Structure formats: C-alpha cells, structure tokens
Amino acid sequence: MLTRIALFLATNFAVLILASIVMSLLGVNPSQMSGLLVMAAIFGFGGSFISLLLSKWMAKRSTGAVVITEPRNQTERWLLATVERQAKAAGIGMPEVAVYEGPEINAFATGANRNNALVAVSTGLLHNMSEDEAEAVLGHEIAHVANGDMITMALLQGVLNTFVIVLARVVGGIIDSALSGNREGGGRGFAYYIIVFVLEMVFGLFATMISMWFSRHREFRADAGGASLAGRQKMIAALERLQLNHGQSTLPTQIAAFGIAGSTAKKLFMSHPPLEERIAALRASTVA
C-alpha cells in the first residue's frame, strides 16, 4: 500500500539526516546507548509515522489525483460502486476514490488506516483495461488496505530506520576509535561524522533491500486478495494486460511502490515481483 521505491523513503531519508544533525548537536554518542536508542527510535519511527499520516495528502498532491465526490459519468459511477462493494466484502470503511492523469496502466492505495484510505487509478488504466480487469486491480488495492499493509510498512520502516541510526553510530564509534586512538577528552573528531554518514548510506541500502522484500511479499498477498474479491481469472487477465502494456510509469517514485507497474531495477530493489511470477502464483493458488 502505503507503502519505493516506497512512499516513506524520501521522508525517512530526510529524517535520518535530521537525526544525525540533532544527535551531533546534543552530543549523543555510542557510549550513551540508552540515549542513543531513545533518540534513534524517536526519529526512526517518527519519520515513518509522519509519512503515514501525510500519505493521502502527499499522494494527491504529487499525482494530481482528483477525488470523486459526485460521479460525472458512468465510469466514475462504476468505480465508486465497485470499490464500495469490495470494501464492504473486505470489512473496511469506504475509501476515497480518485482518478489521476497518466498514460500508464496503474493504481495505488494509501492512507493512515483501514477505514481512512485512498484508492486511485490512472486514466491509462480506465482507457486500456476492461471492466473485469479493472475490477481485479481495484480488488488488489482494496486487499492492500484490508491487509493493513500501510501500518505494517510504517512499523517495518521505523524499525529499519532505528537500526540504521544506531548501528551506524556504534560501528562509526568503533572505527573512529581504531583510527584515532584514545583522543584526549573523549570527544569525537570530524572523521567520525563522515564515517557515520557513509555508514548510514550503506546500512540504508541494506534496509531498502529488506523493505523491498516485504513489498514484494505483500504484492503476492494483495494479488490473492484481489482474486478473492474479483475472481482469479480476472486477476490473471489484469496482470497479463500489464505484460502487454508495460510502459514507463509517470508516478513519482515514492508512489510507484503502491501501483502495479513493472521495474527495470534489479530484483533486490524491486518493489513488485516480476509479473510472470505473480501470474504463476495465481495459477497455482486455490482461489476460485
């Protein structure tokens, strides 16, 4: 859902930089583990949950998505009716439904909780997919909301942020001590802050791999959920349509994680599994 690259990454990166500055100003260092852990958790989880709370606003602003309040045509009436039916079947509150301009076949879901979500589709999806295929895509996004993927991603990102902040400073302190020996006064030199910055980038790379692994895992679950809501054959047909029409996404990178676009990145950094793997998983499933 909410959830790269991922919707949180840009904000979380900024928070990591801010955390580095604040901790340096406050003199927090690896020898003060309790203080370090508290500060790391505040900044680590703070960035994720700020992103989560602002996710709908950020998504609307960055994509130009227009929420349907009063349907203007049959397509919008169908969208609202389909989402309402699927939301009821999934046991969640009715999400806001929006349409954004974009030639790609794509959709995303975001929001702070299961009962306060946003589901948006591109005009490219509406123009290039049949109603059955679009219904499956909507089911996929509703499944993201029903599965609680947004809050789970926020929690995971918070843990990863905290891990990066703490480990970078602990390892940075060890390396700095080894390089400089026992510095008089026990203070940290300029090299320490350079080392910490570099380590945050390196550990952040590994953290991204973990979050991308979770993102791929949740896509399989959302596909299964979409198949349950709309039908397995419709879900397979929607993914096959994507294979035929996979163009370059115009979604911002922080939103694309919640869409259903392909990726040219290496698999470890892909937010979505390859389409052929998703189709194979659906064919092997027992969902009707």
Curated annotation (Swiss-Prot):
What membrane topology is given? Answer: Multi-pass membrane protein
Main localization (coarse):
membrane
Regions that span the bilayer: 5-25, 35-55, 155-175, 194-214
**Domain of life where this protein originates:** Bacteria
| Cofactor(s) needed by this chain | Zn(2+)
Keywords, sorted A to Z: Cell inner membrane, Cell membrane, Hydrolase, Membrane, Metal-binding, Metalloprotease, Protease, Stress response, Transmembrane, Transmembrane helix, Zinc
What name does the UniProt record give this protein?
Protease HtpX
